[in-house]
């Protein structure tokens, strides 16, 4: 009998560990999270870090959200031992900011130092992440709460380094190296990530399935954790049928 895999979650741009207790539909699995290291400025270095986090696992499912999805893609293209499935939410294989105005604003805001970083840069970033569905989610989330998430978890140096990493990485030519079942979770409402990002993943990864979660935005892992986790659960039950899972 195959032993159950561990679900390993990779943080978003904030670097903050996941709130695993909110993912109640996944309670049958062992869950693991982490905090992203500070100031790394390339995705391969982040992938090296995550590889170190799973070195003790015989079987694992990698779940990456947004910036974390880019990291998960980088690791998955290496054919790492033990990886049995991949989940990417709000993810991208190359520079996700295709709107030139949004990119210009983010770049300009990144030059603001000290208190201006918190007051202006993070305020604009929170606005870019927010959706009309956040305040009515299973866990309501305001723009000020999104901004506070970054204030508490993302030093300016790390913000700038992660921007550099996200803008410079390009895995479009390596997506066909991913040989495990892959779920692409896409929010119904998205302003930050370019609209073609999910399509590129679906078309580039050989065994990919896309699920669009209605009435959700980019922060759906935070605002709709039960809906989000249910989609993952259904995917794993369909694709990892040989696992011993207590229901």
What residues fall within each predicted segment?
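Flexible "cap/lid" loop of the alpha/beta hydrolase fold
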Residues: 77, 82, 86-115
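Short beta-strand/loop motif that positions the catalytic acidic residue
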Residues: 178, 184-186
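Conserved HGGG/HGGXW glycine-rich cap/lid loop of the alpha/beta-hydrolase fold
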Residues: 2-40
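Conserved alpha/beta-hydrolase catalytic His-Asp/Glu region
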Residues: 97-99, 118-176
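Gly/Ala-rich beta-loop-alpha elbow adjacent to hydrolase catalytic centers
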Residues: 64-68, 72
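Short alpha-helix in the alpha/beta-hydrolase fold that links the catalytic acid
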Residues: 22, 171, 180, 194-203
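Catalytic histidine-centered segment of alpha/beta-hydrolase-like enzymes
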Residues: 216-229
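Acidic catalytic loop of the alpha/beta-hydrolase fold
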Residues: 189-193
């Amino acid at each position: 009998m195959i032993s159950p895999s561990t679900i390993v979650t990779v943080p978003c741009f904030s670097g903050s560990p996941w709130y695993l207790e909110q993912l109640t539909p996944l309670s049958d699995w062992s869950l693991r999270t982490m905090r992203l290291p500070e100031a790394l400025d390339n995705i391969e270095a982040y992938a090296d870090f995550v590889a170190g986090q799973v070195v003790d696992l015989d079987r694992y499912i990698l779940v990456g959200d947004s910036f974390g999805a880019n990291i998960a893609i980088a690791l998955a293209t290496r054919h790492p031992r033990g990886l049995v499935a991949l989940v990417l939410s709000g993810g991208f294989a190359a520079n996700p900011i295709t709107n030139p105005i949004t990119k210009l604003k983010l770049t300009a805001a990144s030059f603001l130092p000290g208190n201006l970083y918190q007051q202006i840069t993070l305020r604009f970033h929170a606005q870019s992440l927010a959706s009309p569905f956040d305040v009515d989610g299973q866990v309501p989330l305001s723009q000020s709460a999104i901004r506070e998430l970054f204030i508490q978890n993302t030093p300016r140096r790390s913000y700038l380094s992660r921007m550099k990493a996200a803008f410079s990485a390009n895995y479009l030519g390596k997506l066909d190296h991913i040989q495990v079942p892959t779920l692409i979770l896409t929010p119904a409402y998205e302003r930050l990530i370019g609209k073609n990002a999910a399509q590129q993943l679906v078309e580039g990864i050989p065994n990919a399935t896309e699920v669009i979660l209605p009435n959700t935005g980019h922060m759906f892992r935070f605002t709709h954790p039960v809906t989000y986790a249910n989609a993952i659960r259904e995917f794993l039950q369909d694709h990892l049928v040989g696992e011993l899972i207590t229901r």
